[in-house]
Amino acid sequence: MHYNVKEICENYNFEISGVSFIGTPKDESMLFVTNKVKNMISNLIGHRNCLVFVETGIEVPDNLKEDNCILVVDDPQSEYAKLALKIEKSEKENSKNK
C-alpha cells in the first residue's frame, strides 16, 4: 500500500504504506478512531505521518495534528474502509498496467 495523503488533505505531503490500529499505531499508516476508543487517541503521541479518520466530537490535541493528517468525519470506520478499497483498486490497476 502506497498512498500520498495530499490527494485528500492538501496541507500534508507524505505517503502511508500500511494500516494500523489506534491501540498500537505505526508511523506512515492509516487508522481510525471512534468514540468507543477515543481515550486511545493519546497513543498517537510520538508517531508521525499517519492518516487518521476521527469521529466527529473527539478532541484531538494540536500536537497530533501537526505530525499527522487528522480527518474528522461522522463515520470513521466507513471512510477508512472506502479509502482502503480505493487504494487497493488503484494498486491492482497499476500492477496490471506493468
Annotated model-derived regions:
Residues 1-97:
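Terminal amphipathic alpha-helical/low-complexity segments used for targeting or macromolecular assembly
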